[in-house]
């Protein structure tokens, strides 16, 4: 999502909905790579980079002293983010389409929770 598109979305949606939509966008990019697997290519690298940047933002927010979430919630976010980073490194060093599935599932499940959807 371009910065302009993100800004437009942010104007009309709650922060939770923006986060959910961005997680779904990351999941779609990863699904596209997995479905059209050609080995490690530019699309894989771009999808992993987008996902890693997103989770880096979540990590920063969870670590912030200004974050109003309970400590346990923040710690859970950090634990998930650490897993995402580790899996991303695994994908970059020994890529297989199967290793993308946990990243896809995490993003989709958290997006559903943020949106209030099962």
Placement of each model-derived feature along the sequence:
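N-terminal intrinsically disordered, cationic/polar leader segments
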Residues: 1-57, 63-64, 68, 74-118
């Amino acid at each position: 999502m371009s910065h302009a598109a993100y800004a437009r979305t942010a104007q009309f949606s709650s922060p939770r909905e923006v986060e959910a939509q961005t997680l779904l966008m990351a999941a779609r990019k990863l699904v596209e790579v997995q479905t059209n697997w050609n080995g490690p290519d530019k699309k894989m690298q771009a999808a992993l980079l987008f996902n890693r940047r997103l989770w880096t933002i979540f990590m920063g927010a969870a670590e912030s002293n200004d974050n109003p979430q309970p400590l346990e919630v923040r710690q859970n976010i950090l634990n998930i983010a650490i897993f995402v980073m580790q899996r991303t490194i695994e994908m970059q060093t020994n890529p297989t389409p199967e290793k993308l599935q946990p990243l896809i599932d995490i993003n989709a499940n958290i997006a559903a929770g943020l949106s209030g959807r099962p």
